[in-house]
From Swiss-Prot:
The chain crosses the membrane at residues 15-35, 39-59, 84-104, 114-134, 156-176, 178-198, 209-229, 235-255, 263-283, 291-311, 343-363. It is a multi-pass membrane protein. GO terms for cellular component: plasma membrane. This is Phospho-N-acetylmuramoyl-pentapeptide-transferase. InterPro entries: Glycosyl_transferase_4, PNAcMuramoyl-5peptid_Trfase, PNAcMuramoyl-5peptid_Trfase_CS. GO terms for biological process: cell division; cell wall organization; peptidoglycan biosynthetic process; regulation of cell shape. The gene is mraY. Its cofactor is Mg(2+). It is found in: Cell inner membrane. It comes from Synechococcus sp. (strain WH7803).
């Protein structure tokens, strides 16, 4: 038993993170070589460099401001050692991705779309920041009330969707593989609001292990960018470039966020990540690719919903109910089953990479 414990303690996320970063960089350079008009590597490399340096500079400042994460005591006991690790790291890197991504195009329509995506992403970053700050000042693992946070998220999403609707940026159909379309007409608007709320909270739930959300997010942004370039005239190089800038900012952050993490993104980063993914998917008619490629985010969210629903449905007079998972979200289920965090995270990255490849094979034409 002690040998297994010693072996686990020697594991860290250095090599898996290096492999992931190298794979994304390689994919960008290959795409630039093979796909006409592809310039994915430039925003990617710029964002990786800047976010790496800014996070390196910012972590000591977050620590000096006493922005240490409060760890919930009912979670995996191995996480208690992470208490005090600086959080709100999204504040350091989200603006990097947004600014570099916003410089990708100055053409009228594209520039306006990039501005709209940047604003809704930053709005969600601020909402997450308020939530994180509230948690830190109360010294608990909870910040804003769920209803209050959801209301703020919905307000920011509605403002974005109102702008997009006024400009005619969102079609009333969802493009599917094999030249199929799902006509939704006015139903696209409640679906779009649902996508914002569901995706941002799914990325938030995924941010529970060192490097998990940042690695998965970088892969999904890369996948969205690649499928946009593969769609030819139906794609959008400007939005693809924005995606690569966001992928780069999370890869730069991952260098400091991989196990053992020196900093956490907090709701500041995870909510912004989900908002950016949602906005890009809606403006580029990429809801289907996002659904496939973001399968890990979906699974994490569904695991929580199922856990809560089954527990409430089976709760007896003693207040106890059945649990489908050892603990939700899903990554904690594997942890409590004996799989170390240092193994769970690369496995979830690998699943996401597989889903990205599946999404590229089944992207809309």
């Amino acid at each position: 038993m002690s040998d297994a414990s010693d072996q686990t303690s020697r594991l860290d996320g250095r090599w898996p993170a290096a492999i992931l970063i190298g794979a994304v960089i390689s994919a960008a350079f290959v795409a630039d070589r093979l796909i006409p008009n592809s310039l994915l590597s430039l925003p990617l490399m710029a964002a990786i460099l800047v976010s790496t340096l800014i996070t390196w500079w910012g972590v000591p400042r977050l620590r000096a401001l006493k922005m240490g994460q409060v760890i919930r005591t009912e979670g995996p006991q191995g996480h208690l050692s992470k208490s005090g690790t600086p959080t709100m790291g999204g504040l350091l890197v989200v603006p990097v991705g947004v600014i570099i991504g916003g410089l990708v195009s100055s053409e009228g329509r594209s520039a306006q779309q990039l501005l709209a995506i940047a604003l809704v992403t930053l709005a969600y970053m601020v909402i997450g920041g308020v939530d994180d700050w509230s948690s830190l000042t109360k010294r608990t693992n909870t910040g804003l009330t769920p209803r209050g946070k959801l209301l703020l998220q919905a307000t920011a999403a509605v403002l974005f969707l109102g702008w997009a609707g006024w400009q005619g940026w969102i079609a009333g159909t969802v493009s599917l593989p094999f030249n199929l379309d799902l006509p939704l007409h006015w139903l696209i608007w409640p679906l779009a609001l649902f996508v914002f709320l569901a995706e941002s909270n799914a990325t938030n739930l995924t941010d529970g292990l060192d490097g998990l959300a940042s690695g998965c997010g970088a892969l999904v942004f890369t996948g969205l960018a690649l499928q946009l370039m593969l769609r030819g005239n139906a794609g959008d190089p400007a939005l693809a470039g924005f995606c690569m800038a966001m992928a780069g900012c999370w890869l730069g952050f991952l260098i400091h966020n991989r196990n053992p993490a020196k900093v956490f993104m907090g709701d500041t980063g995870s909510l912004a990540m989900g908002a950016a993914l949602s906005a890009v998917a809606l403006l580029s008619d990429s809801l289907w690719p996002l659904l496939l490629m973001g399968g890990v985010f979906l699974a994490e969210s569904v695991s929580v919903i199922v856990q809560v629903w089954v527990f409430k449905a089976t709760k007896g007079a003693d207040g106890q109910g059945r649990r489908v998972f050892r603990m939700a979200p899903l990554h904690h289920h594997f942890e409590l089953g004996g799989t170390p965090e240092q193994v769970v995270v690369p496995l979830f990255w690998l699943v996401t990479a597989g889903l990205v490849m599946l999404g590229l094979g089944l992207h809309p034409r």
